[in-house]
A protein has these predicted regions:
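Negatively charged, flexible loop motifs adjacent to catalytic sites
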Residues: 43, 65, 82, 94-99
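Non-catalytic signal-transmission and effector/linker regions of two-component phosphorelay proteins
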Residues: 1-19, 54, 85, 114, ...
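Conserved phosphotransfer microenvironments
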Residues: 59-80, 84-85
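Acidic, metal-coordinating helix/loop segments flanking the phosphotransfer/catalytic sites
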Residues: 39-57
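Two-component/phosphorelay signaling modules centered on CheY-like receiver
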Residues: 18-37
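Conserved active-site segment of CheY-like receiver
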Residues: 16, 62, 91-96, 115-116
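Alpha-helical interaction/dimerization surfaces of two-component signaling modules
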Residues: 26-31, 47-49, 103
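Alpha4 helix (beta4-alpha4-beta5 surface) of REC/receiver domains from two-component response regulators
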Residues: 68-72, 93-114
Length: 132
């Protein structure tokens, strides 16, 4: 990961939901992360390519899209922004059965889908993949 010496890791958040976006940003800041918040794939690629911080992790909310499409969006962001192939992608699943609740499923070399039971589960996964 591109963690800079004495600099908190940076998470690129793709969150189209206006209600969730500020909460997610605040919670990630409280955990010690630097946060780049974007609304969609195009915005995420532009921000990740920019002159500012390069993300150490990509966090995407499924938000009404099929899960496989969201995984592909994450992979395109990583590729088109020129991020390392081992940059983790975490998808927050929106729709799932009770049997999946509380699970983190690896769907690629460094790609994960998290079926959230609570916010602490997400923070634990992020700390494991991108320690502060």
């Amino acid at each position: 990961m591109s963690k800079k010496q004495n600099t908190a890791p940076t998470i690129l958040v793709v969150e189209p939901d206006n209600d969730v976006r500020p909460l997610l940003r605040t919670n990630l800041h409280r955990q010690g992360y630097r946060v780049i918040v974007t609304l969609d794939e195009e915005d995420a690629i532009a921000r990740a390519r920019g002159d500012g911080d390069r993300p150490d992790l990509i966090l995407i909310n499924q938000y009404r899209l099929p899960l496989d499409k969201v995984v592909n969006i994450g992979r395109r962001i990583r590729q088109d922004a020129g991020l390392p192939n081992d940059t983790p992608i975490v998808i927050m699943a929106e729709r799932y059965g009770e049997d999946m609740e509380g699970k983190d499923v690896k769907v690629g070399e460094s790609d994960y889908v998290t079926y959230l039971e609570d916010g602490e589960q997400l923070m634990n996964l992020l700390r494991r993949l991108c320690p502060v």
